[in-house]
Amino acid sequence: MAISIFTLSAQDVVVGAAQVDQYVPLLKGKKIGLFSNHTGMVGDRHTLDIMIENGLDVEVIYSPEHGFRGTADAGEQVSSSVDKKTGIRIESLYGSNKKKALSKEEISKIDIIVTDIQDVGLRFYTYYCTMVDLMNAAVACNKEFMVLDRPNPNGMYVDGPILDMKYKSGVGKLPIPVVHGLTLAELALMVNGEGWLDNGAKVPLQVVKCENYTHQTRYVLPIAPSPNLRTMKSIYLYPSICYFEGTSVSLGRGTDAPFEIYGHPDMKGCDFIFTPRSVEGAKNPPLLNKKCYGRDLRNLDDEEIIAKGLNLEYLIDAYKCMGVSVDAFFDNGYKYAGAKEFFEKLIGTADVRKMIADGMSADEIKATWADDVEAFKAQRKPYLLYEE
């Protein structure tokens, strides 16, 4: 999934997986479970191949949402398989096999779990949820845990409400803001330090830091982290656009610009038109084959997007242009249990839906969580590995 628009602008950044001399000696003689996917690359080589070339014993690969190759749809169940190149089994942790793969019987076969995966730093992006599941599995079996760190492309700021744990779900596992600003290694340290693992347990944890990275580094991803986050602009907009998943509005799945556009057949006063189609990575997108009217955000300046942080202006704009009841707007059409609260699971609180219905502005809504954001920034400070 390497894409031409993804170029490594922060060329001096060295990811954890590239620092072979740091982690290979620590892993020699141990049976390894590797949590990774298509983003676990160092140049043109996968971390799995680097480990094998250095004589390490990788027993099993754990794959997240979208699978080891990163091609499955969002939410699609992924079956377990075998890596064709190495013959190593791949255990999917996003499907019916998850419970068995994380059982004590299976985890007891390895000595350490190593994480190397590119995250995007948002509470509803599921890779960190899988990492926490693996941390819990490791500590339950007295196994070690290691994170080969990678930059957070949304690590420049912290924003959004803290998750109300009554909305804990597969798209939100921890009491953190939507945009937490942490790398996966920092987040793992915080999970351990704050007692967020089951029964407050702590897993034996080692991290290999990135070099030449700060939280203000504009690190451009060399590989798209998932099928519908194809550009840096979509990654920067993601903290503000993803909430459309909990509404009747399309955010562009099934087009060439997912997470960079939004619209609906009934949006009024909008000149931009698009039609979601069945494509790889979005086989059955919302509003499939329906002409949508909406907004095109592709010409927005990246730095302006970053400066505004979590920006609910797009959601409020769509709500006003639809001219429907708040309940109709937040009906995403899915017919599974809990679908009516999917927006709340994404935003993390019951309050925002009512604030939008009451006509509050994006800035007024943002002000309601400002104190919690500052408190979280102080809470996370002991776990930071990089300059803010």
Over which residues does each language-model region extend?
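Glycine/threonine-rich flexible loop motifs
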Residues: D119-M131
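Conserved functional hotspot residues or short segments at active or partner-binding sites
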Residues: P258, G263-T368, E388
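Glycine-rich, charge-decorated loop segments at or immediately adjacent to ligand/cofactor-binding or catalytic sites
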Residues: G70-G75, M146-K168
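Short internal beta-strands
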Residues: D57-G67, L148
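Glycine-rich, aromatic-lined ligand/substrate-binding cores of catalytic
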Residues: E211-Y293
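Glycine-rich oxoanion-binding loops at beta->alpha junctions
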Residues: S79-I110
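Bacterial Sec-dependent N-terminal signal peptides
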Residues: M1-D12
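Conserved anion/nucleotide-ligand pocket segment
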Residues: K168-I241
